[in-house]
């Protein structure tokens, strides 16, 4: 297991002199996107190789599928170091939500007592970041929430990014999500 001080020293840095927020400690967005790209390097390499060939052959455009996808996928921003480190420490290492020990501003959030809302869980069958079943397991902590207020959807052939982007989102997930909002009287 990586220690938090090592994570702080290797994954955060201060904002440079020529930028707003100079000196502020952040988890740079570029580290996050490089981490995502490194998980499937062959896929991304092939996508850019094929796009270069389309450019050479005059078959590419600014709004083609490749450019549209990567314009969004590569749009990242820095996170405050405090938020990043706190999330890693509290949620992933110490499992505060899973153990029902989560608090905000020193006020304990009793997850088992949540009852006046509805929850829609969306997971991707091919998610290589948050394995399918993690969100569903967390919903079991909502013991006072009626079953009809707990909805889950496992999207076939979708990964971590794909559940909120592209065809799977537009054609399958979004319609179910909008129906969920309507059924639970949520105004958007």
Sequence positions of predicted segments:
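Short, conserved loop/helix-junction motifs that constitute active-site signature segments
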Residues: 111-116, 142-147
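C-terminal alpha-helix
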Residues: 176-187
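Short beta-strand/loop motif that positions the catalytic acidic residue
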Residues: 114-115, 120-123, 127
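Catalytic histidine-centered segment of alpha/beta-hydrolase-like enzymes
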Residues: 129, 153-172
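Conserved alpha/beta-hydrolase "acid-adjacent" motif
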Residues: 128-137
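Short acidic (Asp/Glu) and glycine-rich catalytic loops that position anionic groups and cofactors
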Residues: 63-69, 117-118, 155-158
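Active-site nucleophile elbow and catalytic-triad environment of alpha/beta-hydrolase enzymes
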Residues: 93-111
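Alpha/beta-hydrolase-fold enzymes
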Residues: 1-82
């Amino acid at each position: 297991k990586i220690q938090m001080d090592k994570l702080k020293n290797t994954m955060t840095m201060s904002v440079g002199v020529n930028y707003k927020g100079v000196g502020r400690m952040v988890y740079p967005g570029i580290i996050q996107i490089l981490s995502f790209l490194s998980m499937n390097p062959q896929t991304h390499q092939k996508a850019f190789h094929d796009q270069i060939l389309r450019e050479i052959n005059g078959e590419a455009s600014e709004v083609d599928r490749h450019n549209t996808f990567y314009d969004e996928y590569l749009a990242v921003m820095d996170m405050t170091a405090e938020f990043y480190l706190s999330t890693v420490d509290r949620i992933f290492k110490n499992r505060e939500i899973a153990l029902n020990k989560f608090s905000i501003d020193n006020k304990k959030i009793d997850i088992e007592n949540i009852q006046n809302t509805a929850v829609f869980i969306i997971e991707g069958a091919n998610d290589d970041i948050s394995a399918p079943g993690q969100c569903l397991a967390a919903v079991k902590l909502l013991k006072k929430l009626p079953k009809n207020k707990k909805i889950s959807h496992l999207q076939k052939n979708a990964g971590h990014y794909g559940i909120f982007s592209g065809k799977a989102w537009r054609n399958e997930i979004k319609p179910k999500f909008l129906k969920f909002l309507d059924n639970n009287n949520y105004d958007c």
